[in-house]
C-alpha cells in the first residue's frame, strides 16, 4: 500500500517527521518497505517561460529556445521536442540538476554547435509517466502558475513523500488511506478529519440471483468518458500507484484507495448494444461461470472460464469476473455518457478461487480476498456518485440493493485478569505496575471499538473495518499491547514446559528409516507432482507451472526407477533407494491420500572384492527379499508371501503379495523384463511397496519391536529335515505356519531349505524341504520326546495340504 503523506495529512493530524512516523508504523505492525521522496525527482527543476523559439541552424529536428527562468537574463536551451513553442510555460532542469527517473545530470554544453544551458523536461523525465509525446506544458496542467523560476515540484505534486507499507492478510483496513489515517490517529492521538459519507442512501430492492454476495448497482446519467480527471485526482492516483484513465474510472479508483472498497463502472449504452436488450437493475446477476465461457477482460486478454470462476452477468452474459476485473466490451470509453456503478461484497474464497483459476491478481481482488466490511458497500457507492456529480453535474436515476453479507458479529468479552496475565506489568520508574483501565479503554476506543462495562472487564464491539481481525479476546489484548508499545512491558519467562517426545508411531517411522538405511538403501524424496499418464487416470491440478508437474502421483516407483536410470548412466554399479510418501487417487472432487513405503533395489551389490573374487554380483530374488525380512524382524513383525501374477510392472513368476497379520500389506517382486529392457535397467531390479499406516499400526500395537532380553539356551538343539510334495499353489509360508502351530512347544525354528519341481513329481506338484529345530527348555531332548511332535507335524501337513511325505 502506497501512502501519500500529503494526502494523509488531510485525513489526520500528523506532527511527527516522516522518519518518526515510519518507525511508529513499523513497530505497530505496518512495516515500511520503502520511503519515496518525490521531491528528489524535481530537485533543481523550475518553472520557465519560453520567450522565443527558433529553428536550429544545423539540425532540422532541434529548436533553440530563449527561456525566462526568473534570472536576470533568459537562458538558451536547445530542445528536441516537437511541441515546444514560444509563449508556453515549461519545467526547466537547471545546470547541475539530477533527474533520477532517467539517471541524467544536467550540464552546460553544445548541441550541434549551439550552446545549451539546461533542459526542458517531459513528464517522463520527471518520473510522472512512463511515456510522453513531448515536453510538459504547464499551462495545460494548471491555470494559475507560480512566477518564473519557482520550483516546479508543488505544481506537479512532487512536494510529497510516499510510504510503501507491507499490509498483512489480517489487516484489510490497511489497504485504504482512511484505514491508515485511523491507525495513525490511534498511535499518535492526532485528530481525524475524514470525508463525510452518506451511511444510509435511498435504495430499491434488487431481486435477482446473486450467488451469496451483497450487491448494489447505481444508474448514473450525464458523465463524459472523454474528460480527463482534474490534476489533484491524477496526482493522488499516481502516488497510490494507479494509472489515470479518465474521470469516471479515476473516481472509482480514488474511492478504492481512500475507503478500501473496489468499485466498477459499466458503460450503460454499451451493455444494451452488447446484449441487444434494454438494461435495467434486474438485468444484473451473479453466478458461477459455465465451463467453456469466453471472457475478454479490460487487459484485452481472452480467457476461458470454468465453474470455479464467479461472474457478474447482464442478461446472463458475463460482463465481469466478480471482484477481479470487468470486461473490455462493457468498459468505460471516451464515448461513455451513462454508467451503471457497481459496489459489492463478494465472498473472499470465491474471489480467491476466481483469481487463481485465471492466474489474474488485481488491486480489487487483493482487497476482496482479505475481506471487507459490508457496512461500507453502500456508503462508498454514494461517495463515488457524489464525486462524479461534482465533476460532471451528472444525476442518479436509482440505486438498487440485493443479496446478503456476512452475519453481524457480537461483542467480545475482554477480561481484565486475562490481559494482565498475558502482558504482564509495565516497566515504570517506581517499579512494575499493571496497565490501568483508562489506558486500556483509550486504546480500544481509539481503534473505533465500542465498550460496555462487565464485571470481569469489558464487552467490546469492534468497528466494521476491524471485525474480521478482532474476533477473540487475545486479538483485543494484542491491540492494547501494540498501541501501548510492546517494549514498555517487562520481560517475564513463561511457565516451564515439559520436554516433548515422539509418539509411538513417530518412533516406529523413524526406526523404519534407520533400519532401511542400515541395510544399504538410501532415502530419497521425490515430487508429488507428475505428468499425465496414458496407462492410468491421475488427478489434474489447477494452474500447473509445467506439463511435467500437472497431475498428482499415484505411485512412487516410477520416479524411483528414473533415479536408478540416472545413477546407472552416471557409471554407478547399483542404486537402492526407499521413500516414505503419499500417493493420490480418486477424483478432483474427492481426493484420497494414502501413505506408502516404497523402494527399489537395483544393480550390483557392493561387496568387498574378496567375497566375489573381484567380480560384481547382482542380488537374486531372495537376497533382495531378505532386505524386507531383516527390517521386519527388527520390528518383530512377520510377513508371509502370496504368489502375485497380475501386476503388470512385476515379473509374473517372481512377485509376491506381502501379508501381515492375515491382511495384504503390499507387494514385492522383480521388475518385469519388458519394462527393464525399455528403461535399460538390469534384470536384477526389485520393487516393493507397503501400506505405511497398516505397517505402523502393527509395529506400535504392543511396542513389540522394543528389544527385550532373552536368556541364552543351556541345552543343545536337535534338527530334523522334512520334505513333502504339495500342490504348486501351496505357499511355503502357509506350510511354515502350519509346522510352527503343530510343533509347539518344542519346535524352536523352521526354515525352507529346498524347493524342487520335475516331471517325476506329477503335474502342478512341487517338493518343498524344511529344516526343523527342536529344543527343550531345561533338558536335552531325546528321540522319544521329539518323534511324537515330529509325527504331529507330518500329520498336520497331510491333513491341511494333502501333502505326500518324502522324508
UniProtKB/Swiss-Prot annotation:
GO MF annotations, alphabetized: ATP binding; magnesium ion binding; phenylalanine-tRNA ligase activity; tRNA binding
Sequence positions that bind Mg(2+): 469, 475, 478-479
Q: State the UniProt keywords alphabetically.
A: Aminoacyl-tRNA synthetase, ATP-binding, Cytoplasm, Ligase, Magnesium, Metal-binding, Nucleotide-binding, Protein biosynthesis, RNA-binding, tRNA-binding
**GO CC terms of this entry:** phenylalanine-tRNA ligase complex
Keyword Magnesium recorded: yes
- Is Repeat tagged as a keyword? no
Question: What region holds the tRNA-binding domain?
Answer: 39-153
Q: Which cofactor does it need?
A: Mg(2+)
Q: What is its EC number?
A: 6.1.1.20
Domain (FDX-ACB): give its ranges. Answer: 713-806
What name has this protein been given in UniProt?
Phenylalanine--tRNA ligase beta subunit
Source lineage? Bacteria, Bacillati, Cyanobacteriota, Cyanophyceae, Synechococcales
